[in-house]
UniProtKB/Swiss-Prot annotation:
GO molecular function, one term: histidine-tRNA ligase activity
The name this protein goes by in its record: ATP phosphoribosyltransferase regulatory subunit
InterPro entries on file: aa-tRNA-synth_II/BPL/LPL, HisRS-like_core, HisRS/HisZ, HisZ
Further remark: This function is generally fulfilled by the C-terminal part of HisG, which is missing in some bacteria such as this one.
Gene Ontology CC: cytoplasm
Compartments reported by the entry: Cytoplasm
Length: 392
């Protein structure tokens, strides 16, 4: 039988040093969240498609398949909706501070360079309407990046209510809204100028400026307030100012008033994290106060933060932070009747490991191949050095 030895698009293997680094990063992140008082939650990788089929996930690219009963299931494309399902269906008492880590899957287009399988970690703060919840998410994200020694990172703030308010006042069709969203995301000055000419409103000056309204937080927010008198937008700008003042002591904070998240469920402050050594954002999140309504008749205020751990592993590697794995310095060849003694000797000797070869000569050959400087033989007669690499 000829097996297909290629990997599915958007997936990859991790070996040795990279795999160990990814494992340690996930441990560090989870430990950091635990220290901040977050309680861990785990959900299945496989969910029924209904969990992700709402309007909030209209753009999600799902891995779909049928179970043995013919029901449509998917590999989860994010963690937030499954956690919303748990909170809404188990009757847990709010408010909650939850943390998680695990795999997510998104069926991206071929040759786009995106990973279809990602390791994600994050937090969900549910039941807190206060802006302190956003502040906690941002501070937690900054704390993780500092703990991982990520160099030259920057946190960028936006506000989902700004885009929603603009769309509300323009009263666009679904097709026109998609086109407008694309113009905003691409910061197309020419395209937006043409759009405003064809769709005049009281927000013309503000909309025309959106492609330029990004950069240092204080200056951009001050400029934006002079471009509109709309109460909804001004309220959003005030919330952004409050957060900037609260967290700017911890990191470099910028704003982008044209920031539009891929998922439509965000309702308030949104944020992303970037670094000099990364091509894309590796941290994202924001407020979504109506997301849980798809699972229950009532809504709960919520804020979430997600970290792409694969991107953070790559960042650490590029920054030279990932340490080499501790090399084996002693190989222990043993006779079966001396196994107990060999095991005890290994436990007491740092950077040692047992040999699985039947003969001492094979153990020595292995040590030479993998640059292990010393081999000992453990037998009923005791412990004897049988190979020692010459020091140059």
């Amino acid at each position: 039988m000829n097996l297909n030895k290629n990997l599915p698009t958007g997936t990859r293997d991790k070996l040795f040093r990279e795999a160990q680094a990814a494992y340690k990063i996930e441990q560090q992140v989870n430990h950091y969240f635990e220290k901040r008082g977050f309680k861990r939650i785990e959900t299945p990788v496989i969910e029924f498609e209904d969990v992700f089929s709402s309007e909030h996930q209209a753009d999600a690219k799902l891995y779909r398949f049928f179970d043995e009963k013919g029901r449509l299931t998917v590999l989860r494309p994010d963690m937030t909706l499954p956690i919303g399902r748990v909170v809404s269906t188990t009757g847990v008492t709010l408010p909650l501070k939850l943390s998680y880590s695990g795999k997510i899957f998104r069926a991206n287009e071929d040759f786009g360079g995106e990973q279809n399988e990602q390791t994600q970690a994050g937090i969900e703060i549910i039941g807190y309407p206060s802006i302190k919840a956003e502040i906690e998410c941002i501070l937690s994200g900054i704390g993780v990046l500092n703990a991982l020694e990520i160099p030259n990172f920057q946190i960028e703030l936006g506000h989902a209510a700004i885009y929603r308010r603009v769309i509300q006042l323009l009263n666009l069709s679904e097709t026109a809204e998609i086109d407008f969203r694309q113009l905003i995301q691409n910061k197309s000055l020419t395209g937006i100028k043409r759009f405003v000419a064809n769709n005049p409103s009281t927000l013309d000056d503000f909309i025309l400026a959106i492609p330029r309204l990004f950069g240092p937080a204080t200056a951009i927010l001050s400029q934006a307030k002079n471009l509109t008198t709309d109460k909804g937008i001004l309220t959003a700008l005030h919330e952004m100012e409050t957060i900037v003042e609260a967290v700017s002591y911890t990191a470099d904070i910028s704003v982008d008033l044209g920031l539009v998240q891929d998922f439509h469920y965000y309702t308030g402050i949104i944020f992303r994290g970037y670094a000099d050594l990364a091509a894309d954002n590796f941290l994202s999140g924001g407020r979504y106060d109506h997301l849980l309504e798809q699972f229950t008749s009532s809504s709960s205020p919520a804020v979430g933060l997600a970290l792409n751990l694969d991107s953070l592993t790559t960042l650490q590697n590029r920054a030279g932070i990932i340490k080499k794995q501790t090399p084996t310095t002693l190989l222990i060849h043993y006779d079966l009747e001396a196994l107990q003694q060999a095991e005890k000797f290994m436990q007491e000797t740092p950077n040692s490991e047992l040999s699985f070869f039947e003969t001492a000569s094979n153990a020595i050959s292995f040590a030479k191949k993998w640059h292990i400087p010393e081999v000992v033989h453990v037998s009923s007669q005791g412990i004897q050095t049988i190979f020692q690499r010459e020091v140059d």
